[in-house]
Structures are given as C-alpha cells and as structure tokens.
A protein has these predicted regions:
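Catalytic cores of the polymerase beta-like nucleotidyltransferase superfamily
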Residues: 1-367
Length: 367
C-alpha cells in the first residue's frame, strides 16, 4: 500500500464529482513523518456509488457501516462514506449509522483529535479539532467531551493511554480525569480487544510513565496488580515499591510483547509471599513460582496464544534462578529452556536488576 495509490483512488472518486479524503491514523502518521500502515479513505460517495466507480475492483466488506474495499495492485483500500454514529447502548458499537454530508461531521465522531484529521488529494488538511496542534504539543486529547467519547466505546480509554505510550505523548488533563473516573467501563470490553491494545501499550516508548500514572486502568482487567502499588519491599536490594519496580523493569527490556508481559507480571506474586526476618528485611521466598501461576491465569483470561502464555510463564518461573556461569550450568539451562528462551531469560535478568536500585547496575552490565 502506498500514498501514491491512495492519492490515485482519491482523484478517481473526485473525478466522479464526490469529495474524498485520507482520514484518521494515516494523516496523523504523515504529519509525524512516519510511514502509515493503513490508508483509510472517507468519501461523500455512497457505497453503491463507490461500487459503480471501481467496478470489479470493489468489494462490499462493511455495508452496514458504509464501507467498501477497493483492491489495487499494492493492496486493499477501505473507503467509507461520511457518517455519524447514533447512540452506543452496548458501550462498543453504534446502535445506528447515518450517512453524513460533510467531512467535518464524519471527523466529529472520532475518538481523539490526533485521529480526527483529513487530507485531500491536493494536500489540504481538514482539522476542525486542532489535531495538528496537539501533535505539536505532544498531547492526547479527546474530541469534544471525553466522558461521552468513553461512554460510546470504553476501549477508547485504553486506546488513549496506548497512544500516549506509543507516541511518547502526555494525556490532556480533562481526558486524563475522564480516564480515571470511567476506567470501570473497561469491564465490558472483550479480552481479545484488551490484549491487542496492551501489546501496543507495553511496547511504547513512554510505557513506564503510563503504567505509573494509570495503574487503576490496568487494575480493571489485571486486578492482581493493584496490591503491588505502593507495597514496600523493605529490602536493601530494592529502592522502589513492587509496582514501581515493575514499571521500571518493563521499561528496561527490549520492546517485544513476550518480554514486556514477562516483566509486567514477573513479581505479581510478591505480595502473597512477603515475610519479614528478625532484622526487619523483607523477603519473597517462592515468588517466581507463585507469580508464574498467577501469570498463567492472567494470560489465559486475556485470551493470549498458548505458546506466548507458556513462554511468559516459563520466563517468570526462571527469572530469579541462579544459573552458574559455567559450561555445565549454562548448558543445563539452555537445554531446559531452549536457546530462544534462554536468551530471553538473560534479558529478563538484566532488566530486573536495572530496575532494583542504582547501585545494582553493575550486575546488569555483567549480564
């Protein structure tokens, strides 16, 4: 898929007398200097008119929402008629879709200002909500009333913080307040949709800050994390509470979903294994096993693939094991884990040490 082909489609539609625009994420990415993954198009033309314009290359893939897919030499392009959405009684999908006359009406139904921009074939931007300004300010902000946007589709709550993580942006104050006050709406969202957003969020450049600022949001679908927030480890090897250490550990490892999920859940069983010795030092004997058991349940609940779930649980159960730095010790571990997971385990151990205390950075560097 390419901008050149998308532009050609726009001009073809315009040649038939209908307005057409690139919309949503591709416009955002272009303004950020990134190559878009998808090229979505919105047009004043109705689905049947798009079918007439493109003939055998057009396929009705979402007529209920006014969407027709046009197959080109380099991929498939979705073209959706300008529309407005009705009420969202299920908090996920509009009860009814009504075709609109203008691009401004279409953009008004979108979730975030940075996703509510359009670009015509001449390069003119339609930006009624100052999404371009928010890109410059590096801010995630809802279109209109944030509370209303989240009531329409609760997944937008997680999408907002996901964009903050991935783009390295902050969340605008009113939007942030609405996220915290309406986080419970996420309870109605399917686990599969949660997992897609979380995979992206965890691999974002501002993941640590988002995890620390929005633990209450994650706690809706991973309530096991909440007891870790503010839980002092009472140990000379740790300068952070369990949850803060977790956020730093996630940030310290390569942005790959299995590794990031491993770090998010690697100490989730610490609260349940906490003891204090006579000297007042906290210990968490057996926490890798308990954390692994809890992680297995969490990953299954989120409908994670079996192989991914198994890898995450294995890495968690091994993350605190002492592997002798000998040919035999390394060989035994590699035989038990396989080469890929053994290499992952080294990354896990390094990130865990980096997130403990500044004076332990030498251990991470040794690993």
């Amino acid at each position: 898929m390419s901008r050149e082909q998308a532009q050609s489609i726009l001009k073809t539609i315009e040649g038939w007398g209908y307005r057409a625009y690139l919309v949503g994420g591709c416009v955002r990415d272009l303004l950020l200097g990134r190559e878009p993954e998808d090229w979505d198009i919105a047009s004043a033309a109705r689905p049947e008119q798009i079918m007439e314009i493109f003939g055998a290359a057009a396929f009705p893939t979402g007529l209920k929402h006014g969407t027709v897919t046009v197959k080109a030499a380099d991929g498939a392009y979705e073209i959706t008629t300008f529309r407005t959405d009705g009420s969202y009684s299920d908090g996920r999908h509009p009860d009814a879709v009504k075709f609109a006359k203008t691009i401004d009406e279409d953009l008004a139904r979108r979730d975030l200002t940075i996703n509510a921009m359009a670009l015509d074939s001449a390069g003119n931007i339609v930006d009624p909500f100052d999404g371009a300004g928010d890109l410059k300010r590096r801010v995630v902000r809802c279109v209109g009333d944030a509370r209303e946007r989240f009531r329409e589709d609760a997944l937008r709550i997680l999408r907002a913080v996901r964009f903050a993580s991935v783009l390295g942006f902050s969340v605008e104050e009113a939007t942030s307040l609405a996220i915290h006050s309406q986080a419970e709406l996420l309870e109605r969202i399917a686990a599969e949709r949660i997992l897609v957003e979380m995979n992206k969020l965890l691999c974002g450049q501002r993941c640590k800050e988002v995890l620390l600022d929005y633990s209450d949001v994650l706690g809706i679908f991973i309530p096991e994390l909440l007891p870790c927030v503010g839980f002092s480890q009472q140990n000379v090897h740790h300068c952070y509470d369990i949850y803060t250490h977790t956020a730093y550990a996630v940030d310290a490892i390569r942005p790959e979903p299995i590794l990031r999920w491993t770090m998010l859940l690697h100490d989730i069983g610490k609260v349940n294994t906490f003891t204090v010795d006579p000297r007042g030092q906290g210990h968490f004997y057996g926490h890798p096993r308990v954390s692994g058991d809890m992680a297995e349940e969490i990953c299954a609940r989120l409908r994670m693939r079996k192989r991914d779930r198994e890898d995450i649980v294995t890495l968690i159960r091994w993350h605190d094991k002492n592997i002798p730095l000998t040919e035999k010790g390394i060989g035994t571990a590699m035989l038990a884990l396989g080469e890929e997971n053994f290499r992952r385990l080294l990354e896990v151990k390094r990130a865990d040490n980096l997130a403990q205390a500044p004076e332990y950075r030498w251990v991470a560097e040794k690993i």
